[in-house]
Amino acid sequence: MITIQGKGVSAGVGVGPLYYYRRATAEIKRYTVEDTDAEWHRFKGAQTGAVEQLGQLAEQARAEAGDEAAMLFETHQMMAEDLDYEEAIEDRITNQKMNAEAAVSDTAEQFAEMFASMDDAYMQARAADVKDVSQRILSILCGVVQGGIASDVPVLLAADDLAPSETIQLDKSKILGFITAGGSGSSHTAILARTMGIPAIVGVGDALKPEYEGRQAIADGSTGALVIDPDDDTRDRLLKKREEQQRLQRLLETLKGQPNVTKDGKTVRIYCNIGSPEDVHAVQVNDGGGIGLFRSEFLYLNSSTFPTEDEQFEAYKQVLSDMDGKEVIIRTLDIGADKQIGYFDLPKEDNPAMGMRALFRASAYGKLGIMFPMVTSVWEVREAKKLCEEVKRDLKHEGIPYSEDVQIGIMIETPAAAINSDRLAKEVDFFSIGTNDLTQYTLACDRQNNDLGRFYDPHHPAVLRLIKLVTENAHKNGIWVGICGELGADLALTETFLAMGLDELSVTPRAVLPLRNAVRMTDTRESAERLMAELDADYTAR
C-alpha cells in the first residue's frame, strides 16, 4: 500500500483504477515571416475559432454544472479577445516578424508571469487561464485535436495539471476523481470539480508516477490522501467514509433556512465569497446569509478597456438588488491614479474616484459595505475615508441618491495590520481577516510553491494568535470581525473560531451548509477552555 499526500480541494471519496491523462501538445516552431498581414489574419482566424469553441464549452458547462461553471468559459472568451493580449501578439507578428505560434506562445508566458506575480491568490490562479486560452489558439493553429479517456471503465484521472476546458470536455461518467501534480484550491479546475461534486486532490508533486497507472486507488478529496493498492482495512474505512459523506449531504439539504446558532446559543453570520454578479445564484441556492467578499477584479479581467463608472455601477447595483436587502461587502481594487502597474498598461484615470462613485451610487439599491485591501497603517485608512466623504459630497451636490449607512471596513491580511489592529479598529466599522495572505506573510512562505507546502500552514499558532488578537481588538472597540479567506471553511477550526468570538465567516457558496452544520454542533463553553492550551502547545509542521 502506498499513500501519497496532496491537498484536497473537492470533498468526496473516489475508488477505482488510476489513469494518466495524455495531452496532445502542439509543437511550437519558430521562424521569421515576411508577409506579416497574412500571418496576422492566420492568428485572427484561430482566435475566432477559439472563441466559438469556448462558447460551446460555456453552454456545455451551463447544462452540466450551472451558470457559475459557464462563467469560467465566458471569461475565457473575453480573455481570448482581450485588447492588451491581442496587441501584444500583433506587436510580435507585425514588428518582430514572429510566426503566429511563437507570438501566441511568448505572449501567453508574459501574461501568465504577470498574473503569477500578483499577491492575490484568485488573481495568481488566472495564470493557468491565460495558458489554457492560448493553448486552445495554438491547437487550432497547429491542427492538434485533444484526446479523451481511452478507458472502458470509470477511473481516477491523474495529470500534471488540468485546464478548465479539459476538465469540462472529459466524459464525466468515466471520472471518479481528479489527481494533479500541480494546481491550487483557487484554480478554475478545482472550482469546477467542487461545482460538479467530483473528488479532487492537487499538489501531489513528483510522487505521482506513471508506473502507478492501472493500479487500484482511493482518492480522499477531504484529506488530500491518495492511497494506491489499499489494504482491506483502509478500503473498508474509506468506503464507509464515502457512505457517511453521502448521508451527510442529504442531511445538509435539510439545514436550508435554519439559523447558524451554536448549542450554547451563540450566533455567527455565514456569508459567501464571490467573483462576479453571476455567482449570486450560487449564494441563493446554498442559502448564504450575505456576501462577505465580492471581488471587484472581475470588472478588470472581463474588459479590454478600463471599466467606466457606469459599468461598475451597473454591476454593483445588480448584485445588491439580487441580494434583496442582504449585506454585500465589496472589496476595492488598489490600482490606478498615481499607482500605475506597468504590465497592466492601464490608461491614467482622469477621475480616480470613479470606482468609489460607482459603489456609493449602488448603495441606494441595497445594504452595502466597502472594504479596502492590503491596509497596514492608520494613515491609509484615513485617506480612504477622506475619499469616501469627498465622493458623498459630490453625489449630494449632483442630486444623485446614495445610502448614508454604508459601512467602511478593511482587510487584515498582513502582520502589520494585525499587530496594529487596536488602532485600526478605531477608524472603521469592521475587519475582515484575509487568512490566505496573512498566513503567507506571517510564515514568510510562498503558498504557490509546492515545495514549501509543508510549511504553509494556516493552523500555525502564530497565525491563530494573530486572528485571536485581531478579534479581541475589534470587540474592544465595538466593531465586528470576520474571516473571508479559505480558512473560514476549514471545519477543523470552526470550533476555534467560534470560541475566539468571530462574528462572521465568509466562504464559497458550497461550503455554507457544511459550515452551518458544524456551527450547530458546537458548544463554545466546552471549547473556550481548550483554545489557549492548543495555542500554547508545541508546534510541528504538518
What positions do the PLM features span?
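Non-catalytic, soluble scaffold/interaction modules
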Residues: M1-D322, V328-I335, A358, A362, ...
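Conserved alpha/beta-domain cores
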Residues: Q249-R542
